[in-house]
């Protein structure tokens, strides 16, 4: 019997007690939803397999003492199939012990569902637009963007496991001043000049500049001989200033697609596949910025002051109104944000019911204006728009901060990280910490084969379970027809309980937008499995060296051979663990090796 089944049973008992007039002043409309009747694993196993505080939740509404109400629940629970015993403890806790068959039923449930175990459809019918990374195309993706890549894609997978339709989206900032500075930096590098004060540095700038020159030469264009004088306008219609004219535009139009290709390559190598690559410049070229402003104007949220056009965001909870068209006629950056949200909600293909923005810590000040804009369009902040703010990443090696990249200068890039520790360790280590908290990435630890390395510890549990399968096959042991009720030891019970908690954990991770909970669960399951493996054998091993210690002993230790029926049941439990670990790792975009 799973925790969810127990919650449902307790919910039904509450309604039964009301209908029979045994629950004092409690009425059916005062009973909370089933999900509110949480069933917990007691810290002290002497208190049973599961515990509920339902009586304490309802006692005040019933006008009864919690223990008295708990006794009524206990009497009903005792008669339920699969429950061995029930005890009321303390102020009104209900401690429940399952019979062995009921506790072990989760094994069959896992193996029948396979990689779908725990997945549900409670978010079905909703399209969630999840925008993440969205780094400027002015250089390689840095470590902060790398964290969002790991967290964002893992979050998307978790949401999909809960039935949501997820659109993974990357907003490509190919319009505005940062692109101008990027192009200026390339021109300076091409001429061997110093980087502009507000420009971009790093070996990649020299690389891109050379690629632009080579590509232009192949097209018959001598880019270095193009004018570098005043005159004309850039692709955004802005006047070209000194050092900004035709030559800079040639570098710009060739270099931005190069960076776009590099970013796409990095994301693919990191196992992140976006559904939409949205170009900011299209909002201007397609007239969507003007349409969005006109829409807000029609709603009474636009006014003119000091020669500029303003969004009256204070009407919707912002701390001040926002300029969207400056007095010089140029658009403020926020104008594109307005148009982009409107596009997400009303596009023809997969319009978003919920637009989720994953932003860096430096964007915290954007929340007020974004939520105000959402409300101005008639939507519900927090429901139709959700903003997640991530914190900083510190990369450490030999106890010291790593701040330099061979290619990108003073930042650590996605390729730097994956070259150092691989994609698996990179994704896992970045996703396992709540994005609301800073995270330290210890390169020494994450490249080690030790139990202190969390990704190694979890992957090793999967590899170990695969090895058990191979040894069992060699010994002729199968679990066909196995009686899981024989899984009745303390170690068995711990593994069974861990497996039973996966569906609720997965649902919670989706509702809370918290993929790090998946990683924490996997680490707990791996620890429980490793302990089980050390005390419960499936296949006996011969002792070839009585003096063996440590890892060597783990491979050759002798164990009493279990009877065939119990060996089969343990093999079945082993495979259930293997299934759930593989599923959890996949949700984090991490491989589940069968050998290590």
Swiss-Prot record:
It comes from the Bacteria. This is Arginine--tRNA ligase. It is found in: Cytoplasm. NCBIfam families: argS. Its EC number is 6.1.1.19. The keyword Cell membrane does not apply. The lineage of its organism: Bacteria, Bacillati, Actinomycetota, Actinomycetes, Bifidobacteriales. The gene is argS. Its main location: cytoplasm. SMART domains: Arg_tRNA_synt_N (SM01016), DALR_1 (SM00836). A motif ('HIGH' region) lies at residues 135-145.
